[in-house]
Amino acid sequence: MTLADHSPRCRFALSIVQQLRAAGFQALFAGGCVRDQLLGKTPKDYDVATSASPDQVMDLIGRHKTVPVGAAFGVVMVPGSHPSEGAVEVATFRSDGQYIDGRRPSSVRFCSPAEDAQRRDFTINGMFFDPLENQVLDYVGGQADLQQQVVRAIGDPVARFSEDKLRLLRAVRFTTTFRFRLEPATELAVRAACHQINQVSVERITQELRRMLAHPERAHACRLLLQTGLLYAILPELMNTAGTETQTSADLHARFHMLQHLQAESAEAAWAILLQPLLQPAAADQHNSLTTVDSLLKRLKMSNQEIAEITWLIAHRTALTGLPQQPLHFIKPLLAHPCSHLLLAVTEATHASQNSNSEDARFARNFLAAHSTAQLDPPPLISGNDVIARGIPPGPRIRTLLESIRNAQLDQLITTREEALQLLQQQIAR
């Protein structure tokens, strides 16, 4: 393999390898960056594996230029001098001791590259590349599995997943995002250990799900999560949402079909589709249903913005139905919302999955194209002070009057402040 990436990130990582090699240490690119280059993809970041100890790495590169993020595990971070260079993780070749928390080893022993490869998760991630000699070092059969498009655990899959439970989700993500196959023994090990996924921190689980749901292969990911038992282990709320196991399965697969048609690369839009079964059919009470969704998202420790966007999309999931017949004061605020483009994508995915008419979505897209943000959400013509100044005491009537004037403005019945004040006076006099 010839190094084809000439980005600042690659050049920076290469400079670290050159420094280490010049000092007499072994240094290689490792893991995902090797996999990506063999696949013809540009790596997002670079990891370097070396025979140098963390102290030797910091002494060589400069302690003021390094961050010992996991020195006890042989890991040092080297930030670039410019944002375009990113940061390179430099790890000493190591063999891990016993895993006691399902995530990190209790101890490490520095070793050779061949031994280091055995501790890694999957064969496609277990290769090294010598950028100075343009040579791939493959001790685990990763190149063959890349060619055969297989995700296979290194060594005993049961042991690999026992060491680090997050690998259960990573197996699904790599399989689906690369459009590979999950090797049978590896899949059996995932199924057997699926309920252990909750030993991993919620934040890490959510991050893996976020990455899967934002990817175009999200439907494939959800099907494999269901097939391996991980979906219900992480989201037990989705069990029996349609009354019976058969109905629930059919409804979930219908959601997966919608996800297959979702064009937006948005995890929030995907979540809105995936969680809709929580509102059907027993969840007739919209408020209580959204409370259930909100509680689930908070349990997953999503950000307030993510929760707000997902719950808005679910609450407005049918808002585009019959949109051409709605008044402008309904259409404009809906389409002015920051998530309206995602609502359109969700609606279009729903129609596409059902082979139904998407005239409402087309109308919305045309309306958005024909109206600027200022036209969709113009500044109000009057304020609450104008209402109070006309003798209306503070209370709910002020809001009612303001909404009435605002609706008239959005319906283009009034266009100036003078007209708004005149209409306000008329409504007060009624």
What is the predicted role of each segment?
Residues 1-430:
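Catalytic cores of the polymerase beta-like nucleotidyltransferase superfamily
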